[in-house]
């Protein structure tokens, strides 16, 4: 993802599961609480069956909806695991949406796409990428976007991408994006 010479995603296989439990119940039974689901957002831009809106309107709206649902300000977000499929249009649109929504703070957010390591897991992509975002909170390490060699001049180079090497970072608030064919978009915030 995000490399100038990217030309589409590689399929992968995987499955994942996140167990959600009411906070009071988890505390009462003495469970280890790894993180709290702060909010979620949905949007449907229906711009094109396989291409995002060029300005990333669906991506912008889903992240905005997620922040509003969580009651979290944009400047509180430390990390975003982007949908980042390595498609020429998708990476540009999502990056533009992040820059627009987060303003100057966008350049402080540690950004990655774990699809660079897992491939696109289709129906499992959202949950696996959410687990990776949770891992940044738990372990204080943001996994890299691997195989990045050449910057794309159409992607804002001021964005704080995690290219080729993991970065240690104290992450308190992490976001994960997942977008589907036909413009179905989802976002979660931990």
Predicted regions: what they are:
Residues 25, 48, 83, 120, ...:
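Histidine-centered active-site/metal-ligand motif
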Residues 10, 14, 18, 32, ...:
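Conserved active-site and cofactor/substrate-binding residues in soluble primary-metabolism enzymes
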Residues 62-70, 97, 101, 133, ...:
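Stable alpha-helical structural segments in soluble proteins, enriched in small hydrophobic residues
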Residues 1-25, 125-190:
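Conserved beta-strand-centric core segments of catalytic alpha/beta enzyme folds
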Residues 47-56, 85-102, 121-128, 160:
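Short glycine/threonine-rich loop-to-helix capping motif typified by GTGT followed
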């Amino acid at each position: 993802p995000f490399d100038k010479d990217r030309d589409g995603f590689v399929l992968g296989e995987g499955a994942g599961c996140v167990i959600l439990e009411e906070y009071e119940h988890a505390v009462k039974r003495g469970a280890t609480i790894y993180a709290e689901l702060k909010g979620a957002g949905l949007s449907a831009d229906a711009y094109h069956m396989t291409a995002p809106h060029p300005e990333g309107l669906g991506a912008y709206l889903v992240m905005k909806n997620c922040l509003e649902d969580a009651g979290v300000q944009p400047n509180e977000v430390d990390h975003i695991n982007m949908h980042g499929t390595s498609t020429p249009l998708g990476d540009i649109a999502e990056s533009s949406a992040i820059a627009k929504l987060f303003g100057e703070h966008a350049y402080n957010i540690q950004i990655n796409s774990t699809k660079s390591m897992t491939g696109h897991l289709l129906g499992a992509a959202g949950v696996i990428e959410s687990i990776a975002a949770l891992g940044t909170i738990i372990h204080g390490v943001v996994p890299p976007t691997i195989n990045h060699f050449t910057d794309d001049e159409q992607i804002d180079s001021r964005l704080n991408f995690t290219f080729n090497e993991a970065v240690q970072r104290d992450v308190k608030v992490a976001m994960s994006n997942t977008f589907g064919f036909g413009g179905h978009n989802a976002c979660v915030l931990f």
